[in-house]
């Protein structure tokens, strides 16, 4: 193993080749941030569904009617989440087209 590889002589610490252009690095960073935001959004969705639907609908002792409540709450929450996400994505895309981002 060469010392240059230990000290990052042939590659950067992020694992990208040293010959990467700044635009390649920028694209990779944008992609990574986008993926991390998607994971954070999915986590937030699961947390909110649990908080809002399960706590609202599930009571002890269990009753079959609770399944219907959870199903309806989840469907309503997902419709709302999708509508908000679409509006947000459209707004971001429009800002990108206009050069605001």
From Swiss-Prot:
GO CC list: mitochondrial inner membrane
A single BP term in Gene Ontology: protein transport
Feature: compositional bias, Low complexity: 1-23
Record Pfam families: zf-Tim10_DDP (PF02953)
Region (Disordered): 1-27
Subcellular location: Mitochondrion inner membrane
Keyword annotations of the record: Chaperone, Disulfide bond, Membrane, Metal-binding, Mitochondrion, Mitochondrion inner membrane, Protein transport, Translocation, Transport, Zinc
Cystine residue pairs: 53-73, 57-69
Repeat recorded as keyword: no
Broad class of where this protein is predominantly found: mitochondrion
Membrane topology type: Peripheral membrane protein
Keyword Chaperone found: yes
GO molecular function terms noted in the UniProt entry: metal ion binding
Extent of motif Twin CX3C motif: 53-73
InterPro entries hit by this protein: Tim10-like, Tim10-like_dom_sf
Function: Mitochondrial intermembrane chaperone that participates in the import and insertion of some multi-pass transmembrane proteins into the mitochondrial inner membrane. Also required for the transfer of beta-barrel precursors from the TOM complex to the sorting and assembly machinery (SAM complex) of the outer membrane. Acts as a chaperone-like protein that protects the hydrophobic precursors from aggregation and guide them through the mitochondrial intermembrane space.
Domain notes: The twin CX3C motif contains 4 conserved Cys residues that form 2 disulfide bonds in the mitochondrial intermembrane space. However, during the transit of TIM13 from cytoplasm into mitochondrion, the Cys residues probably coordinate zinc, thereby preventing folding and allowing its transfer across mitochondrial outer membrane.
Record family assignment: Belongs to the small Tim family.
Subunit structure: Heterohexamer; composed of 3 copies of TIM8 and 3 copies of TIM13, named soluble 70 kDa complex. Associates with the TIM22 complex, whose core is composed of TIM22 and TIM54. Interacts with the transmembrane regions of multi-pass transmembrane proteins in transit.
Protein name: Mitochondrial import inner membrane translocase subunit TIM13
Species for this entry: Kluyveromyces lactis (strain ATCC 8585 / CBS 2359 / DSM 70799 / NBRC 1267 / NRRL Y-1140 / WM37)
Gene encoding the protein: TIM13
């Amino acid at each position: 193993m060469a010392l240059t590889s230990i000290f990052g002589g042939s590659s950067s610490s992020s694992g990208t080749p040293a010959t990467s252009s700044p635009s390649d690095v920028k694209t990779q960073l944008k992609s990574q941030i986008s993926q991390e935001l998607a994971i954070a959004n999915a986590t937030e969705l699961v947390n909110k569904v649990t908080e809002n639907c399960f706590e609202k609908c599930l009571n002890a002792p269990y009753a079959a009617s609770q399944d219907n409540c959870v199903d309806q709450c989840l469907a309503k929450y997902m419709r709302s989440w999708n509508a908000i996400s679409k509006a947000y994505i459209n707004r971001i895309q429009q800002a990108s087209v206009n050069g605001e981002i």
